[in-house]
């Protein structure tokens, strides 16, 4: 699943490709992806100009003249832009055509992605209803609030970080990387972390996601950016998908367990359960 770094990389790419373009029509081949009333969606999006691009957590935002198009890529969603002729693609489910002849294509092998149209003034309440936590930046991700939320929860720290309420944008890959850097076992309950450990998890969340954005995200299976290019953050992973290999910090063999239904990688020496 694309996590914050991958979604941010897609956002940056699309910003270079489609900003200022006017939508002439939209071809929806898999209507279940559209979470707004289908008729209203097609009616409202016609003639809109893409004014700017944004992101909130793992959500891509297309700011139009008087609406916001919200896109969630889920497991396998991808965007491709074609300046003229669009090749026939098996998994192309939504095609946004522009007046200049270009087309933005949304492809999704799993068909789990979603699109919905919203008035800009409803955007804040939309994300509040999703219980979406703050962005993982020094400005938005408050350490005090994070520590307080941890103290109130008996959830395993990995599961808690994944549920998006503590901080937005983390997924399975980067949670494993954050907890390895912070030397915290993924199955420990949130309220068992010391103040020092909580600070370390907080800081490494910002560091890991920031580095991953710089590297264009991680290409593990099929992820590519808007230009069809792979990310390179996978070259800097320390534990994810490295079960059976030596820990780069202590040379203990990395282990993989199931935690909350998710494959979880950790070093049993560096990340003791305590």
What kind of feature is each model-predicted range?
Residues 69-169, 174-181, 189:
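Phosphate/anion-contacting hairpin/loop surfaces
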Residues 22-40, 54, 145, 149-274:
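Basic, nucleic-acid-binding surfaces and adjacent catalytic neighborhoods in DNA/RNA-processing proteins
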């Amino acid at each position: 699943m694309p996590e914050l770094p991958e979604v941010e990389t897609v956002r940056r790419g699309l910003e270079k490709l489609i900003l200022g373009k006017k939508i002439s029509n939209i071809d929806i081949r898999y209507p279940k992806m559209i979470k707004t009333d289908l008729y209203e969606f097609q009616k409202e999006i016609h003639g809109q100009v893409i004014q700017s691009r944004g992101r909130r957590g793992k959500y891509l935002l297309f700011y139009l003249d008087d609406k916001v198009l919200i896109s969630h890529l889920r497991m396998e969603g991808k965007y491709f832009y074609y300046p003229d002729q669009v090749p026939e693609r098996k998994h192309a489910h939504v095609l946004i055509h522009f007046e200049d002849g270009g087309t933005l294509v949304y492809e999704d092998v799993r068909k789990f992605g979603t699109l919905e149209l919203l008035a800009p003034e409803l955007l804040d309440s939309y994300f509040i209803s999703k219980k979406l936590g703050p962005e993982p930046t020094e400005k938005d991700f408050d350490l005090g609030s994070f520590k307080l939320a941890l103290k109130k929860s008996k959830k395993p720290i990995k599961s808690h970080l994944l549920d998006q309420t503590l901080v937005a944008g983390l997924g399975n890959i980067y949670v494993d990387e954050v907890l390895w850097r912070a030397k915290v076992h993924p199955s420990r309950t949130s309220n068992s972390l010391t103040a020092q450990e909580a600070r370390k998890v907080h800081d490494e969340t910002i560091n890991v996601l920031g580095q991953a954005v710089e590297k264009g995200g991680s290409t593990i299976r099929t992820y590519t950016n808007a230009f069809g290019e792979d990310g390179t953050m996978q070259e800097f992973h320390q534990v994810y998908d490295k079960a059976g290999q030596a820990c780069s910090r202590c040379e203990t063999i990395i282990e993989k367990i199931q935690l909350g239904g998710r494959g979880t990688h950790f070093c049993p020496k560096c990340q003791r359960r305590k």
